UniProtKB/Swiss-Prot annotation:
It comes from Escherichia coli (strain SMS-3-5 / SECEC). Belongs to the transferase hexapeptide repeat family. GO terms for biological process: carnitine metabolic process. Residues 173-196 are annotated as: Disordered. Keywords: Repeat, Transferase. Overproduction of CaiE stimulates the activity of CaiB and CaiD. InterPro entries: CaiE, Hexapep, Transf_Hexapept/Carb_Anhydrase, Trimer_LpxA-like_sf. This is Carnitine operon protein CaiE. Signal peptide: none annotated. The keyword Iron does not apply. Gene3D superfamilies: Hexapeptide repeat proteins.
Length: 196
């Protein structure tokens, strides 16, 4: 793991969290229980405090950063998709930020909201509970449906279960030279399916 102290502040990682060895955590970063931090994620607590609350996930290639005297927060069961950038913002409880989205300084994403992939949320945006946000700049297009929230929660549960699976079986190895016969396929822990 790549953990760095900065001006006396050392990252705090709950023992039940999983942080991929290629992720980088610097300074004032606090990672809660059951959190998943994916490969190549960068959490730079060298300006402001970064809080990733219980059950949340920060996926591959995400960046978290912020300003002094402010907290950048991913709320409980927050779901941050691959390549997203969070800068000085607050992501509400049980919200989802889609892949490659950017959430700017002072923005607040309401709890149980979904930010569509590739969206840009402007600085100072104030979201409400259970909004579907999309576009550049992002705007609320409607409320999140019960089915969409259920789908989001199943995906978040997959990542919460992945924490234990990674602790139990993930390890560095050498590649095989050819595929073995009867190679098994991985199975999820829920019945979630891709959104169509």
């Amino acid at each position: 793991m790549s953990y760095y102290a900065f001006e006396g502040l050392i990252p705090v990682v709950h023992p039940t969290a999983f942080v991929h060895p290629s992720a980088v955590l610097i300074g004032d970063v606090i990672v809660g229980a059951g959190v998943y931090i994916g490969p190549l994620a960068s959490l730079r607590g060298d300006y402001g405090r970064l809080l990733v609350q219980a059950g949340a996930n920060i996926q591959d290639g995400c960046i978290m950063h912020g300003y002094c005297d402010t907290d950048t927060i991913v709320g409980e069961n927050g779901h941050i998709g691959h390549g997203a950038i969070l800068h000085g913002c607050v992501i509400g409880r049980d919200a989802l930020v889609g892949m490659n989205s950017v959430i700017m300084d002072g923005a607040v994403i309401g709890e149980e909201s979904i930010v569509a992939a590739m969206s840009f949320v402007k600085a100072g945006f104030r979201g409400e509970k259970r909004q579907l946000l999309m576009g550049t700049p992002a705007r609320a297009v409607r409320s999140v449906s019960d089915d969409e929230l259920h789908w989001k929660r199943l995906n978040t549960k997959e990542y919460q279960d992945l924490v234990g699976r990674c602790h139990a079986s993930l390890h560095e190895t050498q590649p095989l030279r050819q595929m073995e016969g009867n190679r098994p396929r991985l199975q999820g822990t829920t019945d979630v399916a891709p959104k169509r």
